[in-house]
Regions:
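Gram-negative bacterial Sec-dependent N-terminal signal peptides
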Residues: 1-16
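Short N-terminal segments immediately surrounding and downstream of signal-peptide cleavage
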Residues: 18-36
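Small/polar-residue-enriched beta-strand and adjacent coil segments characteristic
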Residues: 19, 58-121, 239-328, 335, ...
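Acidic, low-complexity, intrinsically disordered peripheral segments
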Residues: 69, 396-495
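Periplasmic alpha-helical coiled-coil/stalk elements that build and connect Gram-negative outer-membrane
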Residues: 124-235, 342, 346, 366-369, ...
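A contiguous binding-surface segment within folded domains or other stable secondary-structure elements
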Residues: 271, 277-279, 329-390
Length: 495
């Protein structure tokens, strides 16, 4: 229900402005943290094929060319010409103490953990994108509020100066108005600096400069209590799923280490040819071949304590991961409770600050009216204007905090991944596709073409140094050419 509501909300766009959905589509396609994690999963997929290769037949060929330098005794008539030899050997592992079986299971389980980690990274990156989007909206609103405040204060100072000239007000009133105007300009400069920082973060996370941003869609209904949020998070959080699968894989590693104390058995088949290229006086043929077949067993008797050390090491590593499971569970519980509390507090702050803004608007209107008839002082009007500005800023901030905390709660509950958000700006990344391609590969010469860099760069041509320290091998067409204040289009996900 939560996922369906969130998908429907994100699909509702606003004409003429970038939407949160478009920002998330761009993030999904081009964020380097996310695209890098996909490559990490591809590397993990390959470990399954590596583990399986240890249990497959191995064929090798040998070729040799030798010349006899000295002969004595019975070999005097053997000839000194070059001798060529060639052979083909086939070795088939029959029993390896369960090492291959457990290695494959460990690799497969780590692939499952890698997929869960990819989901966790998706949720974390989307949460960063939502935070960056909401920060820009908040800071733009705060800058606008401060700009309006500076205009009002400048008008107040002008009016106060005029009234001072005719003797209606004192120099103190003018000084107070001047001081409050300079304070307003200081607050405006601070707000503009925060906006620039937020826009830079937006560009870093989402991949292009922010344009006009539409208000975000409403969040879906969230859990009614902290306990419900924790319960959902413990069942679906991808970080917890990933570490749990890693703990299972560590158990298979212990079995692999134990296999080092067991015998191994292999079947061998060989064909060998030897030929003498020179003349010989011996009454024997100068060439021949041989075919061999048999079993090769290796029975470890003493290995200097190596198997026991490996077992202890793998058991300790398993214990470490099991402890991490508990630590991750604690973090998930804390994250769910913290996000729920932050969301609840922000919602209450929205209600309180909405009332405060309305009350401060009435108070300011009353102060101005009373000051015009001499029952209020200039400083009281200035204070009323500052209190209104403060309450407006707090309201804008609370709205941002509520939305980000709500999305963070969705992320902790495992409901902020690409499939949950319905991002159809292109085909979603299929983690099973690469696994099917590589996990059962038998071909020694099979390889994939080099993967081009998918993530977009955010360096504009004007910012590029003459001798850059890092020159990644990427398609220059994927460099976002827009300057920081210009919006670039949303890049579609890679095909």
């Amino acid at each position: 229900m939560i996922t369906a509501s969130l998908m429907a909300a994100l699909m509702a766009g606003t004409a003429g402005a970038d939407t949160l959905r478009e920002a998330l589509v761009s993030t999904y396609a081009t964020n380097p943290t996310l695209t890098g994690q996909r490559e990490t999963l591809r590397a993990t997929d390959a470990t399954v094929a590596i583990a399986r290769a240890a249990g497959r037949p191995e064929v090798s060929a040998t070729v040799g060319l030798n010349r006899t330098l000295t002969q004595s005794g019975l070999l005097i008539n053997g000839g000194k010409g070059p001798t060529v030899s060639a052979g083909v050997d086939l070795s088939v592992p029959l029993f390896q103490g369960g090492a291959v079986k457990n290695s494959v299971r460990a690799a497969q389980t780590r692939v499952e953990a890698g997929r869960a980690t990819l989901s966790a990274v998706e949720g974390d990156v989307f949460t960063q994108a939502v935070g960056a989007y909401m920060d820009v909206i908040r800071d733009r609103a705060i800058v606008e509020l401060n700009q309006n405040n500076v205009k009002v204060l400048a008008t107040n100072l002008e009016a106060t100066s005029d009234r001072f000239k005719i003797g209606d007000l004192t120099r103190t009133d003018v000084a107070q108005s001047e001081a409050r105007l300079q304070l307003g300009r200081s607050q405006l400069a601070t707000a503009q600096g925060r906006l620039a920082s937020s826009e830079a973060t937006y560009r870093q996370v989402i991949g292009h400069a922010p344009g006009a941003l539409a208000p975000p869609p409403p969040l879906p209904p969230l859990p009614k209590s902290e306990d419900e949020a924790v319960r959902i998070a413990l069942a679906n959080n991808p970080d917890l799923i990933a570490i749990s699968r890693s703990a299972i894989a560590a158990g298979y590693d212990v079995n692999v280490a134990r296999a080092g104390r067991l015998p191994t058995l292999s079947g061998v088949l060989g064909e060998t040819y030897v030929g003498n290229l020179g003349s010989t006086n011996a009454p024997f043929p100068n060439s021949g071949n041989a075919t061999t077949i048999g079993l090769s067993a290796r029975v470890p008797i003493f290995q200097g304590g190596l198997p026991a050390a490996r077992i202890r090491q793998s058991q300790a590593q398993q214990g470490q991961v099991l402890e991490q499971v508990v630590g991750t569970e604690r973090a998930v519980v804390q994250g769910a409770r913290s996000a729920y509390a932050s969301y609840d507090a922000a919602e209450k702050a929205i209600q309180a600050n909405t009332v405060a803004v309305q009350a401060n608007e009435l108070a300011l209107e009353g102060n101005r009216a009373e000051q015009s008839v001499g029952t209020r002082t200039i400083i009281e009007v200035l204070n009323a204007e500052q209190e209104l500005l403060n309450s407006q800023v707090l309201l804008v901030t609370a709205r941002r905090d509520a939305y980000v905390a709500g999305f963070q709660l969705l992320n902790v509950m495992g409901q902020a991944q690409a499939q949950d958000l319905g991002l159809d700006g292109g085909p979603l990344y299929d983690p099973l596709g690469n696994y099917r391609h590589v996990a059962n590969n038998w071909n020694d010469w099979a390889s994939d073409p080099r993967h081009p860099t998918v993530a977009t760069r955010t360096v504009s041509p004007e910012e590029m140094p003459a001798n850059p320290v890092v020159t990644p091998q990427i398609d220059s067409a994927r460099i976002d050419p827009s300057p920081p204040a210009v919006t670039s289009g949303v890049t579609q996900p890679p095909q």
